[in-house]
Amino acid sequence: MEAMSLFENNLSQPLAARLRPKTLEEYVGQTHLLGKGKVLRRLIESDQISSMIFWGPPGVGKTTLARIIANTTKAAFIDFSAVTSGIKEIRSVMQKAEENRRYGEKTIVFVDEIHRFNKAQQDAFLPFVEKGSIILIGATTENPSFEVNSALLSRCKVFVLQELKTAELVQLLKRALTDEKGFGTQKINIEDELLEMIAVFANGDARTALSTLEMAVLNGDMDAGSATAVTRETLEQCLSLIHISEPTRPISI
């Protein structure tokens, strides 16, 4: 039974999902926006959020930050994918937001990959943004100046999210090893040098870093004391597999 313990901590969810931060204090990275006294942090803490676009590479926390904003401001949160949604879905969501507004509740509509919407789809948000029915938060890996139409862009603040630094990724990996939502209930032996190796490989992407650690731990060697040891050899094998599958990884966190 001890050998199965690694699978008992709700591993129906990936490690990155289990460790998704719920507060600004848990959030790692983007200190240029979220450090004490920084503009975006002040807007969140004072509940003065308006429509905005998060522009940044994959795995830097765009979706997570939108959820934290919704939790902090006590707004209804509607997660909306530009890949699977059209005008019909937009109208349905806007109707729900109007209902919330009548009851005095704010609605944050988070649109992942907003650059995938065409002009007509983006225009469908305009009247609701203008009259304050919704707070629109869009996420994109593409330059919004070219991918978001000017009318909508002019009504949104653009915040640039940066790749996580190697030290920030190492911090995240160490948390995964100690947090009960991660591997905190297990005894995992992995050298700091290997954690840094994962962080460098992840190239600023938190999801890739956590997924790599998860694969390495689940493929580690169990010793007589029920500890899992992650060796350099095991990690290198995992890195080679992840490298092969890298183009298909999700593009946001």
Label each region the model flagged.
Residues T185-F201:
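Short conserved motifs of the RecA-like P-loop NTPase core
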Residues E196-F201, R207-M222:
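C-terminal helical "lid" of AAA+/P-loop NTPase domains
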Residues K157-V170:
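Conserved AAA+ ATPase "SRH/arginine-finger" region at the nucleotide-binding site
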Residues N10-M52:
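Pre-Walker A (pre-P-loop) alpha-helix and adjacent loop at the N terminus of AAA/AAA+ ATPase modules
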Residues I242-I253:
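Single conserved hydrophobic/aromatic residue that forms the stacking wall/gate
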Residues G220-L241:
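Conserved C-terminal helix/linker of AAA+ ATPases
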Residues A3-E8, I44-D79, L126:
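Walker A/P-loop
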Residues I78-T107:
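Short glycine-rich substrate-engagement loop in P-loop NTPases that contacts/grips substrate
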